Amino acid sequence: MPRCTLRFEKALHRDGAERIAGIDEAGRGPLAGPVVAAAVILPPRFSLPGLTDSKLLSAQVREEFYLELTTDEKIEFGVGIASVDEIDRLNILRASYLAMERAVSSLRAAPGHLLIDGLPVPVFSFPQTAIVRGDMRSLSIAAASVIAKVTRDRMMLSWHEEFPVYQFCDNKGYGTPEHLASLRTHGPCPLHRRSFAPVAQTYFPFA
């Protein structure tokens, strides 16, 4: 497993870059709920042992890291959300880009360079570096992945109270067998992405 460090951030600093922001998103794959992105600028000597891709962490550890990341005054972060309606209207890729744009726009000031997990994001005019498996290699991206994931999970937990038959508290909108069974029985709710095939193939009691 790659080590998650500040080596990318430090290399950019040596080249003169300032305000280096890691960006990641959560929620591209689920059948329900928004897509959420986060942008994070870490201080130069930042350390948080164990921080890595949010998908590799337990829910409890994610929450602990989220609290540390969002209460440290030396850490700057922004969150952006694209709604279910925007996902259905734009498609999930463009909605993900929109969430990332909103996350960057909510930083206190514009970043000087972006570190992005996976592939380049064409909507940004800022200099950017795309890093394969970046959420396991760059601490800035890993921090963004945790903030985005916990933010989205908390939203899905709150919506479980309104739509308990879909068990969003457990599946967070992903297409588990139980979730698919609930879709077949009850049809989609307003949180479901109607442009996604498993949802589009069911009836719409809320239409």
Indicate where each model-derived feature is located.
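RNase H-like, Mg2+-dependent phosphodiesterase core
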Residues: 1-207
